[in-house]
Regions:
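Polybasic, positively charged surfaces/segments
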Residues: 2-337
Length: 337
């Protein structure tokens, strides 16, 4: 589909950006584009650049079969240079030679109050009264059975970058650490928000626990598909970009995805915009009623083989941290297969 035939750049406003993509939100009147986001590649060095078509094929062939229930469908659309040039990218450089973009549903469509809990965890509280929806956005990063080091890879990297401790993603994987993980996850939420959730009888913590105790939840799936014999050693053994297999590229992609977990009061309209429900679960809570839990996974971007030197440089820096002792950072859970 040629997007310029049904819309103009003025119908799109800046929404967000990552390290490789920029998102625009549709504000026009065309029904087909309502509640949609336009995802466009940012400018990169040619050697590191992966085209939208390559990404689309990778996601459809490699990622979609793994996460069919929580996959956000994307449509490949044709872009024109003139259309790209007229978008307000807020100074971010777009890859103007790219002929394609991706059209995706806006998971955050609606009115929400955003609370940034940490670098990789955002909380969105719906503004509708009474409260109908709560969304967590989490980047779980590396998920694996840590049986050797004091700190997992994610917590080690957060220490390297001087981020304060929030929660360890490994705690979300095991029956005996889920409650600890959730306590840490919820700890930065402002008291007034917790009071609102309690007052509105919206048991989001209990719902999150129910989600995590399902044996097929997205975190356990990510752990399964990220599995290697030795996550760090495998990277350090690479000699050139040619040594980066498609399987390793997939694993590195899955170590950098984001997850939206949406909790909403259940009624006949819940999830009506997405009949597949994409990983939905209806959960009944005594005294609270029924809730719908929806999980969406995003940022399934194929990692360039040229990044292997960057991955190795990070591992070298993390070496002294893995088994260090930080009084401000409790050790991570150790768990054998």
């Amino acid at each position: 589909m040629e997007i310029a035939k049904i819309t103009t750049p003025k119908d799109w406003v800046y929404f967000a950006k990552g390290s490789a993509n920029i998102l625009f939100k549709y504000i026009g009147s065309h029904d087909f584009l309502k509640d949609k986001l336009l995802r466009i590649r940012l400018a990169k060095e040619t050697a590191e650049y992966i085209s939208t078509c390559e990404l689309y094929d990778f996601v459809e062939l490699k990622c979609k079969p793994l996460f069919a229930d929580s996959f956000i469908d994307a449509q490949l659309i044709v872009l024109e240079q003139q259309f790209l040039a007229q978008l307000d990218s807020r100074g971010n450089k777009i890859m103007t030679s790219e002929r394609y973009g991706l059209l995706t549903p806006n998971v955050l469509n609606g009115d929400y109050i955003r609370h940034s809990l940490s670098k990789h965890c955002q909380l969105y509280i719906g503004t509708q009264e009474p409260l109908q929806q709560v969304i967590f956005e989490i980047k779980p990063k590396w998920l694996y059975d840590n049986n050797q080091t004091n700190y997992c890879r994610t917590c080690s990297l957060n220490q390297l970058r001087d981020h304060p401790r929030h929660f360890c993603p490994l705690d979300l994987l095991y029956e005996d650490t889920i409650n600890k993980g959730l306590s840490d996850l919820f700890s930065p939420i402002p008291d007034e928000v917790l009071s609102q959730l309690d007052r509105e009888k919206f048991p989001v913590k209990k719902l999150f626990e129910a989600f995590l105790r399902k044996p097929d939840n997205v975190f356990l799936k990510l752990k399964c598909y990220q599995k290697t014999n030795d996550p760090s050693a495998e990277l350090m053994q690479l000699q050139s970009s040619k040594d980066v297999s498609i399987d390793l590229s997939l694993i590195m992609t899955l170590r950098d995805v984001g997850v939206f977990i949406k909790f909403e009061r259940y009624n006949n309209e819940s999830g009506s915009q997405n009949p597949k429900h994409m990983g939905d679960n209806i959960v009944s809570m005594d005294e609270y009623g029924k809730f719908l839990i929806t999980c969406n996974i995003y940022d399934l971007d194929l990692k360039s083989q040229m990044k292997f030197k960057y991955w190795q440089s990070i591992e070298v820096k993390l070496g002294p941290i893995y088994n260090s002792s930080n009084p401000n950072w409790i050790p991570c859970v150790k768990h054998s297969d």
